[in-house]
């Protein structure tokens, strides 16, 4: 069984709901999902032992929230090169944060990224059936690529 870490932060609870639904999709695919708020991760050693990493942040002012920026500096020290990665987040006006995370994971961390790209979802859609199903599908697809 593969082990996937979903590390996220959320201000309104929407990105947290996305994280939970992505984890459901991973579990539906028969893999293990662990969800952690990035503020709970204190050192790079806590990022070891996973087969894939999915990082999530809402978008504010076309950017990541500050806690995600700090977390990415921590994650860079964890040597995640070659691991499977994905990124997600909620947004109101622009969905730039997941793309920034995805690009950082791919180009700075040298991770093997999901061929789905980053996944963003308008906040108004997060609570709906289709939005939650899309999150589950993202989780399942990451597992499909893990093998």
What is the meaning of each model-derived region?
Residues 10, 38-42:
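Short beta->alpha linker loops
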Residues 43-47:
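Short amphipathic alpha-helix with an adjacent loop that forms part of the alpha/beta core around
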